[in-house]
From Swiss-Prot:
Non-catalytic subunit of the peripheral V1 complex of vacuolar ATPase. V-ATPase is responsible for acidifying a variety of intracellular compartments in eukaryotic cells. Coiled coil: none annotated. Keywords: Hydrogen ion transport, Ion transport, Transport. Belongs to the ATPase alpha/beta chains family. GO terms for cellular component: proton-transporting V-type ATPase, V1 domain. GO terms for biological process: ATP metabolic process; vacuolar acidification. This is V-type proton ATPase subunit B 1.
């Protein structure tokens, strides 16, 4: 047992590193309460040794005089007050990072689980991340091409954006996420007057994938998918399974984002971070909050959940003078398909839009079942247009939205008055609605459409209407693109 230093500097605290305690006074869920501890620090890492010799890691959550509350990442079963010893390390939780982490699989705590060699760290970084000076942030620009028409044309994702997938139980969000990982690449920005090129700089593109509370089937699906399509060497996987400790879910996204920050800002890579399932993360947060007996907020979630989610989502972006970027696509499953549930509700406030996966489209065998009407990308305007995608992109997107919305209204009206009462114009909108869903929204899981193919397909659908009904597209653009033999 270590000794307490005499006359130690008060600012540093009176705790000597390595001091061990046998003062466990209680266990509540994933928390251990310690008594008679000298100088514990908030967020300090502790090593817990059980009576049988096994060790676990924990983090100080709360300090009150000589009392400390520690959350244990590997769970609290087997911890007693007789044989359990707790050692304070004086360090915050850091994770080893290296370029060698690409192509590897780790558990939720960042330990390799793919039977590969240990990682030789190039640095140890605090998992909470470094604070970024807001004035050093660069506005997200340049489109990330996903190969999915509804996202690329109507909800374009900018490099450095954070945009979630709002899904629900039983919907194919995992398949969509895997498809995005397979097909994602940058659209190179070129000088005005030239066409942009789709999906460039793939060698500089990396994916960090963090799974929280997923079942073994989902974990195997992603692992197999990455290996089969040959993209595994640019992917780092962090897997916290449903049978892993709940508390580990709180650190998994932070370890993943710390790795992403290293790859982006130190190695100059364009990193796409996919976090699934943020609903499991929110439930883990609620569990810790309940164990600490905090006053619950809406539906039992803690009042600080908004702040906590922001500490994850706001770690996306670009920094002045650094070539790399972090783009985030968190996935969350809405309980009972309820978009007003605290998790999607607060997520929508923080992130820059959302992509909505729709059950009705899924029930009609349309894949990917992305409903464009409630979907939104707030930074789309800075990622598209001449020199970045094509000059007609914005107008085509607006016209597709307008016609699809009118088509939905006509469909509802048809259910009331019958098809005979509809005008010839209404019937055009119904034809557009059907073809839009069957040809534009629907595409195969391995069907990659670059942005130019998607825009050309959109024009094919818009030609259902006479020119005078395309109110959202300027005459100049119509002259260039409306006729079938227009030069693209």
């Amino acid at each position: 047992m270590g000794l307490v230093k005499e006359g130690a500097d008060m600012e540093e605290g009176t705790l000597e590193i390595g001091m061990e305690y046998r003062t466990v006074s209680g266990v509540a869920g994933p928390l251990v309460i310690l008594d008679k501890v000298k100088g514990p620090k908030y967020q300090e890492i502790v090593n817990i040794r059980l009576g049988d010799g096994t060790t676990r890691r924990g983090q100080v959550l709360e300090v009150d005089g000589e009392k400390a509350v520690v959350q244990v990442f590997e769970g609290t079963s087997g911890i007693d007050n007789k044989y359990t010893t707790v050692q304070f390390t004086g360090e915050v939780l850091k994770t080893p990072v290296s370029l060698d982490m690409l192509g590897r699989i780790f558990n939720g705590s960042g330990k390799p689980i793919d039977n590969g060699p240990p990682i030789l760290p190039e640095a140890y970084l605090d998992i909470s991340g470094s604070s970024i000076n807001p004035s050093e942030r660069t506005y997200p620009e340049e489109m990330i091409q996903t190969g999915i028409s509804t996202i690329d044309v109507m909800n374009s994702i900018a490099r450095g954006q954070k945009i979630p997938l709002f899904s629900a139980a039983g919907l194919p969000h995992n398949e969509i996420a895997a498809q995005i990982c397979r097909q994602a690449g940058l659209v190179k920005r070129l000088e005005k007057g030239k066409h942009a090129e789709g999906g460039g700089e793939d060698d500089n593109f990396a994916i960090v994938f963090a799974a929280m509370g997923v079942n073994m089937e989902t974990a195997q699906f992603f692992k197999r998918d990455f290996e089969e399509n040959g993209s595994m060497e640019r992917v780092t996987l962090f897997l916290n399974l449903a049978n892993d400790p709940t508390i580990e879910r709180i650190i998994t996204p932070r370890i993943a984002l710390t790795t992403a920050e290293y790859l982006a800002y130190e190695c100059g890579k364009h990193v796409l971070v996919i976090l699934t399932d943020m609903s499991s993360y929110a439930d883990a947060l609620r569990e810790v909050s309940a164990a600490r007996e905090e006053v619950p907020g809406r539906r039992g979630y803690p009042g600080y959940m908004y702040t906590d989610l922001a500490t994850i989502y706001e770690r996306a972006g670009r920094i002045e003078g650094r070539t790399g970027s972090i783009t985030q696509i968190p996935i969350l499953t809405m309980p009972n398909d309820d978009i007003t549930h605290p998790t999607p509700d607060l997520t929508g406030y923080i992130t820059e839009g959302q992509i909505y996966i729709d059950r009705q489209l899924h029930n009609r065998q349309i894949y990917p079942p992305i409903n464009v009407l409630p979907s939104l990308s707030r930074l789309m305007k800075s990622a598209i247009g001449e020199g970045m995608t094509r000059r007609d992109h914005s107008d085509v997107s607006n016209q597709l939205y307008a016609n699809y919305a009118i088509g939905k209204d006509v469909q509802a009206m048809k259910a009331v008055v019958g098809e005979e009462a509809l005008s010839s114009e209404d019937l055009l909108y119904l034809e557009f609605l059907d073809k839009f869903e069957r040809k534009f929204v629907a595409q195969g899981a391995y069907d990659t459409r670059n942005i130019f193919q998607s825009l050309d397909l959109a024009w094919t659908l818009l030609r259902i209407f006479p020119r005078e009904l395309l109110h959202r597209i300027p005459a100049k653009t119509l002259d260039a693109f409306y006729s079938r033999d227009a030069a693209h």
